[in-house]
Amino acid sequence: MDPRVAWIQPEQKGPANALWMQIWETSQGVGRGGSGFASYFCLNSPALDTAAAAGAAGRGSGGLGPALPAASPPPPGPTAPAALPPALLTALGPAAEGARRLHKSPSLSSSSSSSSSNAESGTESPGCSSSSSSSASLGRPGGGRGGAFFNFADGAPSAPGTANGHPGPRGPAPAGSPSQHQFHPGRRKRENKASTYGLNYLLSGSRAAALSGGGGPGAQAPRPGTPWKSRAYSPGIQGLHEEIIDFYNFMSPCPEEAAMRREVVKRIETVVKDLWPTADVQIFGSFSTGLYLPTSDIDLVVFGKWERPPLQLLEQALRKHNVAEPCSIKVLDKATVPIIKLTDQETEVKVDISFNMETGVRAAEFIKNYMKKYSLLPYLILVLKQFLLQRDLNEVFTGGISSYSLILMAISFLQLHPRIDARRADENLGMLLVEFFELYGRNFNYLKTGIRIKEGGAYIAKEEIMKAMTSGYRPSMLCIEDPLLPGNDVGRSSYGAMQVKQVFDYAYIVLSHAVSPLARSYPNRDAESTLGRIIKVTQEVIDYRRWIKEKWGSKAHPSPGMDSRIKIKERIATCNGEQTQNREPESPYGQRLTLSLSSPQLLSSGSSASSVSSLSGSDVDSDTPPCTTPSVYQFSLQAPAPLMAGLPTALPMPSGKPQPTTSRTLIMTTNNQTRFTIPPPTLGVAPVPCRQAGVEGTASLKAVHHMSSPAIPSASPNPLSSPHLYHKQHNGMKLSMKGSHGHTQGGGYSSVGSGGVRPPVGNRGHHQYNRTGWRRKKHTHTRDSLPVSLSR
């Protein structure tokens, strides 16, 4: 793995790390520029952990500049460059001297102009950055970039009030300010505050000792980059689960960050309203769904009556009102979706503005609905977004994938997981994260397989997707069918999908080793973070959030007028969702029957058979013994009045499920059999949506009952056979079970076809998850189930 993207793991640290990285540099032909400065040198520093930050707040940093008190954020505005500690200067050698000379040069931006075209066109890969663009980043005195290690100046101390030389966002730069002469578009990648690109050169050998102040009495606390880690975690996969929850709570947006973003939106909305009073500005993307990181951008769409999007007109108005930095406004009129990209002048928040794109607003509502369905989805998304963001793989523009593609991949992963019901909130997040990396880093066939989200989700051949595509494009490497726009490939522009696959594979290797039993023998197992092996937070992000909380602390409560449209939409969506959930199947019978299934085999086969055909080229071993964990699911069915009359009224009522006084309860179980006899009145009963059971009595009750597939509908009309399609009845008549694909017989009806509520998934534990693939093998044998009978 490229050491500029991957990191040296804690148990691998040693004196040979720096030598090995120099050998790798030579073998890859990654040389130093003419100045002697390494193009892969990291421009951010890892964040202090919680305990270290509190202990180091009140003392000097031992050569890295005065430390920032925990409650005092760095002030905005241009700041003076910081000095390097002597220990780190010695460790870096000629690289530091070359950077020092570059900082003195007055023609910095002009000397690096040759690299701007590639950076702006997006053709530059995340792993290849020119030395001139890296060097141009060094002298920037504000914006959270540069840091204590990279703003080199002869004897210039850190500016008062800065956190180790990492200033917060700056305000408008005055005339003649150095920042106006040192800005260059070639620094696009280096303006990512969360980037850990090249961090290994700060964590290896003597550089790591220099980073902590040389180990002397005035040494600064170590910087592991895991500020969310404030306690000891359980060993193995359970500890990773606990750490993901802590990371989510630490990185989730705070009210001050939301207030800051609303203020940015308000400024842009004011400019739009001045131009077009009838225009409507709406928010979509991560700010609308709440799945945004501290440095995420804001997506806006302007609705109005134009024949062509007025990109240039809005660009001129934004420049006139000084809303954005002049050099940051870019008009991408040749893109698939023409947009205006800008960076807010005051907050440095990046904003994307599009025109009349309804799909963005619909996509935000689509994601919100799935967040309600899968409560674990936000945790996975926030971890995955941080994982790609710090490697500059979070945008198609920089050679990665879009956030929308990532979210659809996560939804598909949860939909088609063969072993768990992702709608449950008690699943292990650590296991889900490792399996996500395994699927998309190792097992998924990017060449032949596409991803479908609608209709329960499926993996389909790209040839099938190509038949439905209306734009004339061929399926891309990462082919994701748009669930909202038929014929659109969401991953069409993700030309760097294979780089994302590579880092997913790297993360799977690292995490699977970290949670293995062997990891318990590591000498530093208690001090190191498992999630911190693949994710780190930079000090620049921490300082940026401090500055936000200080400045917008009094504005944290949203104004009613700002979010009125969003709140109304959410209220409407919530009401629609409640109506959908509360909708019951229509039936000519008026009484309800609460059915409790305590046998996991009653629901498992229908669930698994319906999703077999959607797993293309995959392997799931289903020959292993079934899971014995009991699962009881309750759902409502319509029962005929004559049948209810034959049931005793003294049967127990399930706890927590209030029913009308006319309701009766039927409990079916395969563990403890109860018998009762139904009197012999003649019954003319239509089929009801429940499983057929043998009933002993003088009269023959023969009704066909259909059971719908509760989890994932089949993508193929020919599902594989299931061992549970026939139940051997030991007590009563021997009757075959009908299929579960909505067919009817004799005037019967299917619960799904009639708008019925799908029952929850039964226990899918008998399909064990095989790490080597995702295929399901055909069942060639049958299993006898325990008898199911009803009697007094």
Curated annotation (Swiss-Prot):
Q: What is its EC number?
A: 2.7.7.19, 2.7.7.-
Region: Disordered, residue numbers: 55-191, 601-632, 737-792
Q: What gene name is listed for this protein?
A: TENT4A
Where in or outside the cell it occurs: the entry states:
Cytoplasm; Nucleus, Nucleoplasm
Q: Which organism is it from?
A: Homo sapiens (Human)
What is the documented function of this protein? Terminal nucleotidyltransferase that catalyzes preferentially the transfer of ATP and GTP on RNA 3' poly(A) tail creating a heterogeneous 3' poly(A) tail leading to mRNAs stabilization by protecting mRNAs from active deadenylation. Also functions as a catalytic subunit of a TRAMP-like complex which has a poly(A) RNA polymerase activity and is involved in a post-transcriptional quality control mechanism. Polyadenylation with short oligo(A) tails is required for the degradative activity of the exosome on several of its nuclear RNA substrates.
The similarity annotation says:
Belongs to the DNA polymerase type-B-like family.
Q: What is the name listed in the Swiss-Prot or TrEMBL entry for this protein?
A: Terminal nucleotidyltransferase 4A
Q: Where does Mg(2+) bind?
A: D297, D299
